[in-house]
């Protein structure tokens, strides 16, 4: 078993951070077809003694505790798309809804059927793009997705409408990356108000599919104030020298590194 992305946040509402690790499954013989069997996500919840308790059983999997059948969570994000004030989880293209005490159930719309339709995303983000109090759901597809003929888009935003009826949210297509359709790997994404207009923008750490993981590129997506994301990389981050031959694996973070009031 192995994990790739962590979410650290207060899941059980006790004021202390907890830890979620999304499962990328259990590697098995390729003779089984998938090469990956389900394996449970990992959840550590803080207790009154200030210690962590292994609480993975708190996550519904519809598979007798053996792990969700989506198998491969290359992604994981925490946020509040249902607007109830606690931290939900989005991993493996399934939304895990928190009851406020650190127990997670699978959302009735963003469930295994949704995963089968859109497959496992390579990267994802929960962020309130239109300032309506509900975190929107953003995800980028793998370049080698099995359903490319039916799903040629590189990624989507599920844009909230001021309600928690996610099945009614508008689905917008994300701008493609610089290396071409089905040739771009969207490793990691982060949000922040880059242009100080009061709306969250997004940056994406990107690399090539071929040559494999060759080049490290940062895509800058600017929010228009209504939740639409426009690719303004060419104007805002020019001369990316590492985009040619730097190793493309890595994370991306948005912070004010030099304390000048502007996000880096």
Residue ranges and their predicted role:
Residues 27-55, 93-107, 145-172, 212-233:
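Beta-propeller blade repeat segments, especially FG-GAP/WD-type strand-to-loop junctions
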Residues 19-23, 89-92, 137-141, 202-206:
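Hydrophobic beta-strand segments that make up the repeating blades of beta-propeller
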Residues 10-12, 16, 48, 79-82, ...:
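Calcium-coordinating acidic loop motifs
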Residues 24, 38, 71-78, 91-94, ...:
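Solenoidal tandem-repeat scaffolds enriched in leucines and small polar residues
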Residues 2, 17, 37-40, 72, ...:
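Residues that flank catalytic or metal-binding motifs in active/ligand-binding sites
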Residues 13, 37, 46, 70, ...:
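Residue-level signal for WD-repeat beta-propeller blades
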Residues 22-29, 56-61, 141-144, 206-208:
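Short regulatory "switch" loops immediately downstream of catalytic or recognition motifs
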Residues 1-7, 59-77, 110-125, 174-190, ...:
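Repeat-based blade/solenoid architectures
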């Amino acid at each position: 078993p192995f994990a790739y992305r962590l979410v650290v946040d207060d899941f059980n509402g006790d004021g202390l951070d907890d830890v979620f690790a999304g499962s990328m499954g259990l590697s098995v013989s390729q003779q089984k077809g998938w090469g990956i069997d389900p394996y449970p996500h990992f959840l550590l919840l803080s207790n009154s003694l200030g210690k962590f308790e292994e609480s993975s059983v708190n996550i519904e999997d519809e598979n007798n505790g053996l792990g969700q059948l989506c198998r491969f969570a290359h992604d994981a994000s925490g946020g509040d798309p249902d607007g109830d004030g606690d931290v939900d989880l989005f991993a493996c293209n399934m939304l895990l809804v928190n009851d406020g005490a650190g127990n997670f159930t699978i959302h009735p719309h963003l469930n295994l059927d949704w995963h089968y339709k859109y497959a496992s995303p390579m990267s994802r983000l929960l962020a309130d793009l239109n300032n309506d109090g509900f975190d929107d759901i953003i995800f980028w597809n793998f370049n080698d997705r099995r359903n490319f003929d039916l799903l040629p888009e590189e990624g989507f935003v599920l844009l909230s409408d001021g309600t928690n009826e996610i099945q009614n949210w508008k689905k917008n297509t994300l701008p493609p990356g610089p290396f071409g359709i089905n040739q771009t790997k969207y490793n990691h994404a982060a949000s922040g108000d880059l242009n100080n207009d009061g709306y969250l923008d997004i940056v994406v750490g990107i690399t090539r599919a071929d040559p494999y993981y060759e080049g490290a590129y940062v895509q800058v997506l600017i929010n228009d104030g209504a939740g639409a994301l426009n690719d303004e990389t060419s104007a805002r981050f020019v001369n990316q020298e590492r985009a040619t031959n730097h190793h493309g694996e890595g994370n991306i973070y948005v912070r004010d590194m030099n304390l000048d009031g502007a996000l880096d």
